[in-house]
Regions:
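Amphipathic, Lys/Arg-enriched alpha-helical patches that create a basic surface
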Residues: 217-250, 263-295
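Short, well-structured beta-strand
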Residues: 11-28
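Generic structural signal for well-ordered, non-transmembrane alpha-helical segments
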Residues: 43, 47-50, 91, 98, ...
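Ampiphathic alpha-helical segments that act as solvent-exposed interaction surfaces
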Residues: 25-69, 273
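Charged/polar positions within long, soluble alpha-helices
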Residues: 54, 58, 149-160, 246-257, ...
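Short, small-residue-biased leader/transition segments that mark boundaries at the very start
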Residues: 2-7
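Helix-loop junctions and short alpha-helical segments
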Residues: 70-241
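Extracellular/periplasmic helix-loop-helix junctions in multi-pass membrane proteins
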Residues: 258-262
Length: 295
């Protein structure tokens, strides 16, 4: 498997129908790259197929190019390590948001529906505390924060690893590193970039902004201050992101339940996190980076 599961290979037994269609044997080697696969991923796939043919001979079928035709690398943009890293991080973040959204799209709970259809308002408010769906939506708030932390934290780590200006700033950095961390770096179990990233709290907007402004000259607060249309509502993205962070904090540390958190409200929060990611990616592109999101 390649970085971020962009490139995969596996051996499996094919059906009789597939054997007839592709004129192949019972067992085949199947390789694939996601649509976000880079020049390097396609190159690796070609190399794998060449080695397999040297060992086992036979033919192969390429979905895009036909029988015994290797992928034409000239058809793919060659990304820098930074561009590839951010593309994978952003794609993974958006994909996870899409998965939870699809999961909730068909979710229904008969008990919740019964409570919602009650005509007596006072009884409805009382029974909200027993609504299993409200518990579910509240418990999913930390998931959204995990996406934000992953996206901003890992993008930051990639920048300070590959961006020349950010790396030059590391020269003047005074950071105390414990012996355990030094050993982990020497054994390649950790990296200096990840250790520096760990010194910031990427569940906190002020901390995110501090890290990005110091090393990347990127003002995240300014980027997220835009007013955008999210699920037919005009919102200030920064305000909604702070709502998500605050809700997660109250839920995790105080078990504070928001009994007004509906399915639609949670779906709006998902869309807000996606909007924040896309706005930030757009700011990266304005710096001249080529970034592709597979979603």
């Amino acid at each position: 498997r390649g970085l971020g599961d962009v490139y995969k290979r596996q051996v499996y037994k094919v059906s009789t129908e597939e054997r007839t269609k592709y004129k192949c044997s019972e067992w085949i080697l199947h390789t694939r790259t996601r649509s976000s696969g880079s020049y390097e991923d396609k190159q690796k796939q070609n190399e794998t197929i060449r080695k397999a043919r040297q060992l086992f001979e036979g033919t192969f079928y390429n979905d895009w190019y036909g029988t015994n035709a290797y992928t034409n690398l000239n058809d793919y943009t060659k990304f820098s390590p930074l561009e590839k890293g951010i593309s994978i991080i952003a794609s993974n973040s958006i994909e996870k948001l899409s998965q939870i959204e699809n999961c909730l799209a068909g979710y229904k709970n008969e008990v919740s529906d019964s409570f919602a259809n009650m005509n007596i308002e006072s009884m409805k408010e009382l029974l909200k505390t027993k609504d299993p769906s409200i518990m579910l939506y509240n418990s999913l708030m930390p998931f959204l924060v995990a996406i934000l932390e992953y996206f901003y934290g890992q993008c930051f780590a990639n920048f300070i690893k590959y961006d020349t200006n950010a790396r030059n700033l590391l020269i003047d950095e005074k950071l105390k590193i414990g012996i355990a961390d030094v050993i982990a770096i020497l054994q390649k179990e950790n990296s200096l970039e990840q250790i520096i990233a760990q010194s910031y709290n990427f569940q906190n907007l002020d901390s995110i902004n501090k890290a990005y402004k110091k090393y990347l000259s990127i003002d995240v607060m300014s980027i997220l201050s835009e007013r955008k249309k999210v699920n037919r509502k005009i919102i200030r993205v920064l305000v909604k992101i702070q709502e998500i962070l605050d809700a997660r904090h109250r839920f995790v540390h105080e078990l504070d339940i928001n009994y007004n958190l509906t399915k639609q409200a949670y779906l709006d929060y998902i869309a807000t996190v996606e909007c924040a990611i896309l706005l930030t990616v757009e700011s990266f592109k304005q710096r001249g980076l080529k970034i592709e999101i597979d979603h």
